[in-house]
Amino acid sequence: MAVVDFMEVIRRTETGPFIEERDFDIEVIFKTIRGLVEKYGIEYSRDKLITADPEMADAAFQAGLELAEEAGIFCVDTSRQIQFSREELLYGLKAAPRELRIGSGKDQRVLRASVYGQTCRPFIWAGFSGAPMTEQTFRQTIRSYIKEPLVDALGHGSLHVVDGIGVRTGSPLEVRATRQELMYVREALWREGRPGMPYVAAESSTTALGDLATMHPDFMPAGNFHFVPTLNELKVDYQRLTKTMAAYEYGIYNINLVDAIIGGYAGGPEGAAVVTIAAFILGLIVHRASVSLCHPAHNKWVSTSPPESIWAENLVGQAFARNSPIITIGDVWTSAGTGTKDILNEITAITITKSLTGNHPHGVGATNGKFSHGSGLDARCMAEVAHAVYNRGLSLEEGNEIVCELVGRYEDKFSDPDIGKPYHEVYDVESALPREWWLEIYRDFKGEMRREFGLQL
């Protein structure tokens, strides 16, 4: 047996069962997920944000697999369900890559799937993820992430203004913006002496225009990555399928970006976890995904630092690590901004969870990408926390205790987070190095983590 051919996926966008989108949302997504959560006894606990219950992780995986089989994925352009048999879904899981050798020269790295019970060196994917920036801010900030020695791969947001003109969806500027983005990425990698570092890019275009415009060795050499989002919940359109086909045939890796909404049609954190598992399974076939990215988005706060988001991602990671390991990464998105202690607490709580439950950290998306208040020191914290967890051999129970404590220090601030400072106030722009006052805050934080929790950052 082989993985379902992509042309067969396209065929099923035309021949699958017809259903109105509203009916898919309510009858298929909402009602099915609610029933599966009850059937499998999946239950959120604020006191167990990192669950040590393997049976719940296994139950969540089975619920997600059942949802993937029953719902399939809805094609917005044709109002058809693209459905797959249980056998097709399981073979897609079996055929998924367990490791990728990416980058070149001294910057080559191996990105591996996490297997339950086995230690796996963390893979650090860093940059000001999700942030729309001006050209000047993009070029200034990107160097601060590349300079960090623990960073393995780059993912650095998008340009929303080019030559002083705003980039509109579907406009010719999506082509120009995405090419400019790639030019700045490659320029910065050469400047900082890491030309072979792998990266995810082409983020400056919401349609397929930008991706198509950069699939050339001068912009996006084969072997790098771009995002192909699964639309909420379990949906796809021709734009996403175009991205998939072009990248698959050209030779860059697709990352299936899934941002299930906690408080949306999937329900609470339990349903968000189940629909994310289903989306990951379906994305292996529909998006030809080599990597799957988890971002359970809180419907009010967006970031991945609320306790409900942390719990959902913990369950997704453990479900795959135990039942069918695939390469998964997870967004480190904070409500607070750079230059604050709050962002360090959020980064640490999210990163501990990811490191213990099978999701390599990707970030930091400071201020949820609303403001250009991010810096390379945010990524340093993320990387050093991940390596501290790995080096110490932290248990799930120990990690849960730390994470629950840290979440308690910031969870009452989501309605009015400290957005911190813009990049030029926390970093010297010319040297791309952190200012002393920001370094001092981080040094104090590291000492606090060592004294309170025994984490050697």
Where are the predicted features?
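Metallocofactor- and cofactor-centric catalytic cores in central/energy metabolism, strongly enriched
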Residues: M1-T214, T230-V236, S372, C404-G408, ...
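Helix N-terminus capping/helix-initiation residues
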Residues: D53, S85, G267-P269, S375, ...
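Secondary-structure junction/capping motif
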Residues: E55, Q62-A63, L67-E69, G267-P269, ...
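Helix-rich catalytic cores of soluble enzyme domains
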Residues: I124-L356, H360, G369-S372, R380-H387
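Gly/Ser/Thr/Ala-enriched C-terminal appendages of enzymes
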Residues: I350-P361, T367-L457
